[in-house]
C-alpha cells in the first residue's frame, strides 16, 4: 500500500515510516524542502494546485494518508510568533491534503493528527473521545485542525488521533533526561 506521511521527521512519524516499510508498504514522506530520494515528495503546504502537482499525482494512487505535521508543543515559551507557527504548521498542511483529495480523488483512509488538548484542562476527570471540547489555545487549535480534516471527501474514512505528549527513551524531552537519571 502506498502511504503518504506528513510529519515524517517527527518522533511518531519516524517510527511509523520505519514500521510501514518493514511491513512492505510504500511509505512516502511529504517534505517541505527538495526531496532527497524516491521515498520523499516535496510539497507546498498552503500552496496552490499548480504548486502541488506532484502531491496530486501521488494522492491519486495513495491507499492512505497520515497527517502528523505540526511544530512541537513542547517548545517554550509560546510567544505570539510561535503560536502562529503551531497554527500554520497544522492547519495549512491539513487543508493542503484535503484540497488535494478533493481535486484528484482520495485515498481510502485519512488519519489526521489532533491533540488531547482538545479537551482543555479538565483536572482529574476521566475523559472519553465523545467528551466535549474544552477551552483555551490548544482546544481551539485542535478543534480547528479536526474541522479541516473532517472536510475530506465523504468517500474517505477519516480518523482523528488525539495524542498527548509522546515519550521515547532516545528522543525528545525524555530522551534528553534519562541519561541524567
Spell out what each predicted region is.
Residues 25-32:
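Conserved glycine-rich Rossmann-like NAD(P)H-binding loop of the short-chain dehydrogenase/reductase
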Residues 3-23:
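N-terminal Rossmann NAD(P)H-binding glycine-rich loop of SDR-like oxidoreductase domains
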Residues 6, 30, 68-69, 110-116, ...:
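SDR active-site strand-loop-helix element
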Residues 83-85, 94-136:
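Conserved Rossmann-fold NAD(P)-dependent oxidoreductase catalytic core, especially the SDR/UDP-sugar
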Residues 35-96:
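NAD(P)H-binding glycine-rich loop region in Rossmannoid oxidoreductase-like domains
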Residues 134-159:
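Active-site Tyr-X1-5-Lys
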Residues 153, 157-160, 164-181:
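NAD(P)-dependent short-chain dehydrogenase/reductase
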Residues 15, 19, 100, 148:
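Rossmann-fold NAD(P)-dependent oxidoreductase module
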Amino acid at each position: 500500500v502506498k502511504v503518504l506521511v506528513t510529519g515524517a521527521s517527527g518522533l511518531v512519524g519516524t517510527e511509523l515510516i520505519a514500521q510501514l516499510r518493514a511491513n512492505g508498504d510504500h511509505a512516502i514522506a511529504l517534505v517541505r524542502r527538495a526531496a532527497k530520494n524516491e521515498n520523499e515528495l516535496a510539497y507546498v503546504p498552503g500552496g496552490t494546485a499548480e504548486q502541488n502537482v506532484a502531491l496530486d499525482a501521488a494522492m491519486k494512487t495513495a491507499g492512505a494518508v497520515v497527517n502528523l505535521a505540526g511544530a512541537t508543543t513542547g517548545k517554550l515559551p509560546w510567544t505570539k510568533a510561535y503560536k502562529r507557527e503551531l497554527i500554520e504548521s497544522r492547519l495549512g498542511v491539513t487543508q493542503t491534503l484535503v484540497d488535494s483529495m478533493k481535486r484528484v480523488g482520495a485515498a481510502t483512509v485519512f488519519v489526521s493528527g489532533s491533540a488531547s488538548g482538545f479537551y482543555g484542562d479538565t483536572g482529574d476527570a476521566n475523559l472519553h473521545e465523545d467528551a466535549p471540547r474544552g477551552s483555551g489555545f490548544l482546544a481551539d487549535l485542535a478543534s480547528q485542525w479536526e474541522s479541516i480534516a473532517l472536510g475530506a471527501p465523504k468517500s474517505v474514512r477519516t480518523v482523528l488521533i488525539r495524542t498527548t505528549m509522546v515519550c521515547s527513551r532516545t528522543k525528545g524531552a525524555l530522551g534528553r533526561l534519562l541519561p541524567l537519571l
